[in-house]
Swiss-Prot record:
Domain of life, per lineage: Eukaryota
Cellular component, GO annotation: chloroplast thylakoid
Further comment found in the protein's record: On the 2D-gel the determined pI of this protein is: 5.8, its MW is: 45.8 kDa.
Protein name, as recorded: Unknown protein from spot 125 of 2D-PAGE of thylakoid
Keywords from the UniProt entry: Chloroplast, Plastid, Thylakoid
Major localization class: plastid
Places the protein is found: Plastid, Chloroplast thylakoid
Amino acid sequence: XAEIEAEQNIE
């Protein structure tokens, strides 16, 4: 799930 980690990091 590293690909979503960046997406969650924008929060």
